Amino acid sequence: MQYFDLMKKACDSVGMEFNEDKYQKFMLYKDLLKEWNEKINLTAITEDEEIVKKHFIDCIKAFKADEFKKAKTVIDVGTGAGFPGLPIAIMREDVEVTLLDSLNKRINFLNEVVNKLALKNVETIHSRAEDGARKKELRENFDIATSRAVANMCVLSEFCIPYVKVNGNFIALKGPNITEELNDSKNAIGTLGGKLKGITEVEIEGTDLNHNLVIVDKIKSTPKTFPRKAGNVTKKPLK
């Protein structure tokens, strides 16, 4: 129970319940992450305490956005090693979480975690973001699309906003210093049917890190021309 108090403090700060069962799930997730990371590249963060702080607590802090407390369906686009989707699923067993990633090896890892943690509320999908968003069963089908992927907001918006229902939200987990990036992405967000709602700063317990939650309202349907074909989204970001 080495990290229980630290994680509970983080949960308390965003109004989320934490208990021993959730803690044990996070610890098993940590062990699987370290084990699989020796076979495939999942994370550069490999020390137990750093995983707890910079992965788990960072994702738990997403609940500072009330939207994550109310949503019934969430898709994590470009989920990688499962962040923030898996922590959201552990914290809220009543929300349906879809994890989407383009690399099959990562999907195999995620399936292992879902099975070992006995998570009944998680589905994994092997797909590129721009391909998945063109599928009828996924497009504009989620209360929230989220991503912690390392990409510019213009790019992330085109990857994520098409998945969001009208009146839902796209929420990006970003680092500090995002003012310029957001200014550059406002037109793109609007083109895709979104409108910037606000930015929520979060502190990560036990570190000097400050991160930001960028919250976008989906106010109208995304034009059928988006997302563009593979490659164009990153090569020629919307402006």
From Swiss-Prot:
Keyword Nucleotidyltransferase applies: no
EC number(s) reported in the record: 2.1.1.-
GO cellular component terms listed in the entry, alphabetical order: cytosol
Domain of life: Bacteria
Gene Ontology molecular function terms on file: rRNA (guanine-N7-)-methyltransferase activity
Enzyme class: transferase
Subcellular location: Cytoplasm
UniProt-listed InterPro entries: rRNA_ssu_MeTfrase_G, SAM-dependent_MTases_sf
Binding residue positions for S-adenosyl-L-methionine: G78, F83, A129, E130, R148
Alphabetized UniProt keyword annotations: Cytoplasm, Methyltransferase, rRNA processing, S-adenosyl-L-methionine, Transferase
Any Pfam family matching the protein: GidB
Alphabetical list of CDD domains matching this protein: AdoMet_MTases (cd02440)
HAMAP family in UniProt: 16SrRNA_methyltr_G
Function: Specifically methylates the N7 position of a guanine in 16S rRNA.
Protein family: Belongs to the methyltransferase superfamily. RNA methyltransferase RsmG family.
Protein name (record): Ribosomal RNA small subunit methyltransferase G
Organism: Clostridium perfringens (strain SM101 / Type A)
